[in-house]
Structures are given as C-alpha cells and as structure tokens.
Amino acid sequence: MEYLKDISSSLSGWEFNFAPGWQSVTASVLLVAGGWFVVSRVWTFLRVLTSLFVLPGKSLRSFGPKGSWAIVTGASDGLGKEFALQIARAGYNIVLVSRTASKLTALTDEITSKYPSVQTKMLAMDFARNLDEDYEKLKALIQDLDVAILINNVGKSHSIPVPFALTPEDELADIITINCMGTLRVTQLVVPGMTQRKRGLILTMGSFGGLVPSPLLATYSGSKAFLQQWSTALGSELQPYGITVELVQAYLITSAMSKIRKTSALIPNPRAFVKATLSKIGNNGGSPGYAYSSSPYWSHGLVAYLATCVINPMSKWLANQNKAMHESIRKRALRKAERENAKKSS
C-alpha cells in the first residue's frame, strides 16, 4: 500500500510540475496559428486589391496576332455584342454567333462602319435546339480560320425567380442545353486548332450563381456551377498547350437577361464590364481561391472575395439570404404581371 501511495504522490507531482509547461506550449501554438490566420487573410486581401486595381492582365496579342479571329457566342445583345465590338477594335476579325439573324446583320454593319479593316462572319443558330447541322455549319465556317479567341457568352436564365418544382419543363431544358451543351460543343470545335497552334484564349461567362447556391434560380445556378467546374478542369488540361482558359465570375450587369437598366457601383453596364474583363485576363481579381477563374470588375471582385474568402459560399445562411432576395423579386414580378394583365383586360 505504501508503494502505491508513493506512485500516486509521484504522479501528482508530475501533473503539478508539467501542467504549466503544457499550458504555455498550447498558448504558443494558438498564438502562432492565430497570427498565421490573420496574416494569411491580410495577404489574400492585399492580393485581391493588387489584382483588381494595380496589375494588368495578359495582352490579347499573346493569344494571336492582329488579323486572327475571335468567336463570340450570344453576340447580338448585351455582353456578347460588347465583347464583339471591343475585340474588333483591338484588330481581330470576328465570327458572330447568335439566334437572331437581323441583329447579327446590324452588328456586322456596325463593326464594318467603325472598323473597316476588320472582317466579320456570322451564323444564326438557336442553341436551344442543339441541332447537329448547326454545329456542322459552324465547323465549316471556322475550319480554315486562325481562331485565337473564343468568348462563350451564350446563356439563358429563368424569366423570373421560380421554385424548382414550378419551373416549366421547356425552361429547364433550354437553360441546360444553352448554358452547358452549347458552351461545350462550341469549345470542342475550337480546341483542336488552338492546341495545334499552341496558343489561344477560351473565356466563358460564369455567374455568382455558380459560386453561391441560388434558391428559386436552382437550374440556372446549377448550370453555372457546372461551367465553373468544367472550365477549371479544362484549364488544367489545356495549360500545357499554351491555351488560357478562364471563367469570368460576374454579378449583376445591366442587360436583357438581368432586366436591370440602371447602373450603380455594383451593377455596371456591358461596356464597363467587358473593358475590365479584357484588361484583366489571367488575373484572379476577387477570386484568389479559384484556379482558371476571375472576378475582374472591381466591385464584383470585392463581393466575390467576401462571399468566398470571408463567408462560406456554401453555407445555409448565405443560401437563405439568396432565397429571401429571390422570393422578394418573384413577388414584385408577379404583382407587376398582374397589373399589366389588368390593364390589358380593362
């Protein structure tokens, strides 16, 4: 018994003697970890600011010489039209692809009048139909061209925020077919030539809806999340061939799709957004944690940083905030539709 008492006394002594040391080590580890966390967050934020406001992007000339070709899908309106105009101004010939032939003709005339040395080709095709013959026509149109740039801009969203269970089947099909299949099939036509030439730019329009789950825009959000993953994987595949792949993470822009007409600090017009995008190619902007991706417009970049680096973009809280916002938008849209219907019937 005395032997056990001696052991107990010894153990008690060890606990008494070593506990303060362990507390000191624990405190030091926590201090170092906390300091590292703060420093890394500050460093990341400084990288974001530098990328958004200081560092220039890659020159378009690095993807192909003046006189080579750029393909712009969804080219007849909004961002697509602005991409076509600004790339034409840089001296690239343009292939315009969109649904409405009359709008493509008007844009062709505008480009020709502003930039007489720039050649244009156009193809009217409805991406929602996903016809093999349309893609064969596009393949034939570009097969002998030095395509240096592809702007995957074609896209479709919901007409108004809508619960998934109430989404019309044709709207579901159109969103997936246009946003996903259309982008993939056009890109697949362009990649072999770029790989052979060992240069090129594939720029795909993404959305914050692909970063943050967007209730009442579930199908659109899912399609953009798909493009986010696909583009990142493609970027890794094509980097060894000298091809730059970039997905542009965009918030709201004044356009027919967003149905927003008034600009603000958070909502630029297409001209300002495209200018920022083309001047920041290769920079992550506000998306430092996303490879082969960028949020180049300054205010969008800051919001993207908050959503992805400060807040968990997949959190239930953020999804619920989006849900509340879209429910409010839906209510206003339905009330507006009711008023318009009442006017028509009166």
Curated annotation (Swiss-Prot):
Parts of the chain that traverse the membrane: 26-46
Lineage: superkingdom: Eukaryota
Function as written in the Swiss-Prot or TrEMBL entry: Component of the microsomal membrane bound fatty acid elongation system, which produces the 26-carbon very long-chain fatty acids (VLCFA) from palmitate. Catalyzes the reduction of the 3-ketoacyl-CoA intermediate that is formed in each cycle of fatty acid elongation. VLCFAs serve as precursors for ceramide and sphingolipids.
Lineage: Eukaryota, Fungi, Dikarya, Ascomycota, Pezizomycotina
Residues that, per the record, bind NADP(+): 71, 126, 134, 153, 220, 224, 253, 255
Protein source organism: Emericella nidulans (strain FGSC A4 / ATCC 38163 / CBS 112.46 / NRRL 194 / M139)
Metabolic or biological pathway, per its Swiss-Prot or TrEMBL entry: Lipid metabolism; fatty acid biosynthesis
EC number: 1.1.1.330
A GO molecular function held by the record: very-long-chain 3-oxoacyl-CoA reductase activity
Keywords: Endoplasmic reticulum, Fatty acid biosynthesis, Fatty acid metabolism, Lipid biosynthesis, Lipid metabolism, Membrane, NADP, Oxidoreductase, Transmembrane, Transmembrane helix
The protein, known as: Very-long-chain 3-oxoacyl-CoA reductase
Coiled coil: none
PANTHER family named among the record's database cross-references: HYDROXYSTEROID DEHYDROGENASE-LIKE PROTEIN 1, VERY-LONG-CHAIN 3-OXOOACYL-COA REDUCTASE
